[in-house]
Amino acid sequence: MTDPDLHQNDPENPAQASEPVVSKPYIMPDDPETGSAEAYAKEAAEARDKMLRTLAEMENLRKRTAREVADARMYGITGFARDVLDIADNLQRALDAVPAETRANADAGLKSLIEGVELTERSLLNTLEKNGVKKFDPTGQKFDPNFQQAMYEVPDPSVPSGTVVQVVQAGFMIGERVLRPALVGVSKGGAKAAPAASNDQSNSAA
């Protein structure tokens, strides 16, 4: 009796041979479609625009940071500089307290003392200026409330009205800012003062 399982496992049985598997062609999921060149060109242009915007923002940030650092260096000493001005004022008051006649007739000791005070004042002002703090004297200029504070009026028809004719206390700038306005006396009674050509008080340092 013939076992049917033997014929099924017979390698020479042509019915057992499997049919060949035909693979389908592989298609890339991102294969470009017809007419997509314009879309890619648009995407490239948008990417370039974003890159340029990012670079511009980075450059603006760099400039802003540099400016903030410079301001911090310049104006970080504002409080200290304002306190030091009291010392400069006291030195100036000490010199102003000595009459010109006394100076002319002073002995060697007093002259040496006066010269020492003058040297100290100059050294202090030079140190302040090295750190961006500059003294200004607006005498003869048109009164400007941005840089000066009027303490009183001086009747004087010989000069244009609104002209600074006396300085009670010198002003100081720190960088481009007013550290302390000058205390001044302003003329009254003359012709109206002409507009100032420039309000840059730092150019009138004493």
Swiss-Prot record:
Region (Disordered): 1-38
Leader sequence residues: none
Example GO molecular function: adenyl-nucleotide exchange factor activity
Pfam family, one: GrpE
Cellular component aspect of the GO annotation: cytoplasm
Residue spans of biased composition, Basic and acidic residues class: 1-10
Gene3D superfamilies tied to this protein: 3.90.20.20, Head domain of nucleotide exchange factor GrpE
SUPFAM superfamilies in alphabetical order: Coiled-coil domain of nucleotide exchange factor GrpE, Head domain of nucleotide exchange factor GrpE
GO biological process, one term: protein folding
CDD domains: GrpE
Major location (coarse): cytoplasm
Keywords: Chaperone, Cytoplasm, Stress response
Plastid listed as a keyword: no
Location in the cell: Cytoplasm
Segments traversing the membrane: none
HAMAP family associated with the record: GrpE
Function: Participates actively in the response to hyperosmotic and heat shock by preventing the aggregation of stress-denatured proteins, in association with DnaK and GrpE. It is the nucleotide exchange factor for DnaK and may function as a thermosensor. Unfolded proteins bind initially to DnaJ; upon interaction with the DnaJ-bound protein, DnaK hydrolyzes its bound ATP, resulting in the formation of a stable complex. GrpE releases ADP from DnaK; ATP binding to DnaK triggers the release of the substrate protein, thus completing the reaction cycle.
Subunit structure: Homodimer.
Similarity remark: Belongs to the GrpE family.
Protein's name according to its UniProt entry: Protein GrpE
Gene: grpE
